[in-house]
Amino acid sequence: MASTPRAKTFKSPTKTPSNIYRKSYLSPSSTSHTPQTPETHTPLRRSARHVSRKIDLGNDPIDAPGNDPIEGMNLIRKRERAPRKPTTDVVPSKSKKTETPKKKKKIDSFTPVSPIRSETIKKTKKKKRVYYNKVEFDETEFEIGDDVYVKRREDSNSDEEEDPEIEDCQICFKSDTNIMIECDDCLGGFHLKCLKPPLKEVPEGDWICQFCEVKKSGQSQTLDLPKPPEGKKLARTMREKLLSGDLWAARIDKLWKEVDDGVYWIRARWYMIPEETVSGRQPHNLKRELYLTNDFADIEMECILRHCSVKCPKEFSKASNDGDDVFLCEYEYDVHWRSFKRLAELADGDSDSDQEWNGRKEEEVDDSDEEMELDDEVLKSKRGGLTSARGGANSRKGRFFGVEKVGMKLIPEHVRCHKQSELEKAKATLLLATRPKSLPCRSKEMEEITSFIKGSISDDQCLGRCMYIHGVPGTGKTISVLSVMKNLKAEVEEGSVSPYCFVEINGLKLASPENIYSVIYEALSGHRVGWKKALQCLNERFAEGKRIGKEDEKPCILLIDELDLLVTRNQSVLYNILDWPTKPNSKLVVLGIANTMDLPEKLLPRISSRMGIQRLCFGPYNHTQLQEIISTRLNGIDAFEKTAIEFASRKVAAISGDARRALEICRRAAEVADHRLNTNKSAKNQLVIMADVEAAIQEMFQAPHIQVMKSVSKLSKIFLTAMVHELYKTGMAETTFDRVATTVSSICLTNGEAFPGWDILLKIGCDLGECRIILCEPGEKHRLQKLQLNFPSDDVAFALKDNKDLPWLANYL
């Protein structure tokens, strides 16, 4: 195949920070219809920028075999599978100095992959890479997140055409610096003076050229299109080549240099024109509209022609005079599911959230690569100076677990217009949604989890193991496991730990316990099926050892939070999940998390035996640990007095030891202090003091429902205490009246209180249900009536712990 010489240097258009949405929340859509593009947000294009296009109003998709654009591109890929020629070093040799003219370098090694579906290239040896955030290449600066034109190898002749900086007028076929207007239909450029009648200025609103108006009126037979002068060669712009399918557009996801041969590469995330989608170009598609895909490819930087600019609808509507290389992107297109997804409007973030639905997982590409930390060096290429920047992709390792999937939403300008005070920084840092940089006070537990997982996946056989993690709420069980998995992911990228696949499931998100089969199978295979079919396929994989794809060869780590919610009448769900790791070659590691300590003892013997003896207890935090957690969050922020932090820590440690409650009290105390300082401008103490913490505690623990608990009858207090005690014993939020009545009888007998009887207890439970202190079913179910606390158990403990009439209640709370 003929190679394409590099295009001449072209000045990159001005880049804007809001080039395109930096992060997307992706999930295959259930519909395959092309979504409508709202005209209110993306008006039709009209501008005075220099544009040109042949007057062609065809709206049909690109012709391909079977009218399927993806099948058509498959024919192209057959020509790309030839073995690549070895690349040459871009650094010029210093030993030879001759005056002979240099020959143009052939770029047979350039292999931009089809944006329909990338071909995963198997690597035969490990390659060392140096990653960058920004490089200067051919006197043009490229950085992660830029949008660029990319050469299309299968039609290399189109890339060799001249790229005019100023396009020709569609009437006089001359290019000059006079103002031109763009037709919103055909995107053709016209001089104002060449129009009939001529225009003195660019009109407001939509503008359609006279030729398009004639075509729309149905009189195309009488249309006399202008013809270029004889010998005049019409040069197409990059925009025309892209929209006609002769070029590709991509977003730079990574930048690196191969240390072995010195060639610079990028990871490109492809854009797609509407004609290349399954629906083709629809009437509602704008002429400059592109779709961001979930398809990636690694290509050499020599394939890049120059910058373009892909904008969100809001920025696109303001880009009337930003040049010809401006495009709109409002939707993402899943090339595997052939579905559309509206892009979330996010700002300057990494595009990491698409890892769940990428057809080409990143670990499949980078597991064999040995990444190197970037050193200070001046890089030079054959084209010119190439400068490096510190950081790059090396700073983004291990980034797909847990709450790190959550993106940063766009902050309004009025919020960012002033400098944050210390109290405002403290309030933002103490939010429960804020992920801490480090996790203090749990290093011992994290080391034990790490050694357990490494020991489970390091063996080639990987027979499978189970670990049960338990502890009261708010003790850091889940976040500790997620932090361990994040660190292990970084070690996988470095090559010190063998690759694995990780599946995280929360029992609270399951409609029924059996749905966990469908969730596991979908996470492993990407296909959504019913739970019975999923159970059959999972049995074939874990029990019978059938392997389907490459992912099946990797060990699987399954994290199940709220494990106790999977308990059914016959306990078959837990039995199946815990039985799989015992099978030969299952390569399954199960981590179960629950609040109750003795859950294995409450299960059937066949299940508790499979759960194993590997258990890890997360005890409640004491006041010293809570103080360290809060101080770590507030590191570098001088907003709290030390006595205020200590007071909040001791108060929470005496009740429950819940770190989340301590953080919430401190955050509320910061809000109280901020209000106090705004009210009293002359206040000398600008920090959060003990009085602010006390006010926050009183506000939190003196809510109306707590006052109701304090004022109920003695038997009602015993009833609530029995419900809390039953919750601590079983770890189940939901219980039955039969169990609560049995617990009340035991408590009364132990402490010398007269048992009131079942009928009176039933009436007490119904009365508490009417007050909405508890949630209960109708009373006619009697012993089988289901009960559940409507508020946290900590609130019940706080309300009843210091009761003077029944001081022994504190022993059960």
From Swiss-Prot:
Residues 226-344 form the BAH domain. A zinc finger (PHD-type) spans 166-215. This is Origin of replication complex subunit 1B. It comes from Arabidopsis thaliana (Mouse-ear cress). Disulfide bonds: none annotated. Belongs to the ORC1 family. Residues 436-803 are annotated as: Necessary and sufficient for ORC complex assembly. The gene is ORC1B. Residues 11-21 have a biased composition (Polar residues). Mg(2+) binds at residues 561-562. A motif (Nuclear localization signal) lies at residues 83-90. One of its GO terms (biological process) is DNA replication.
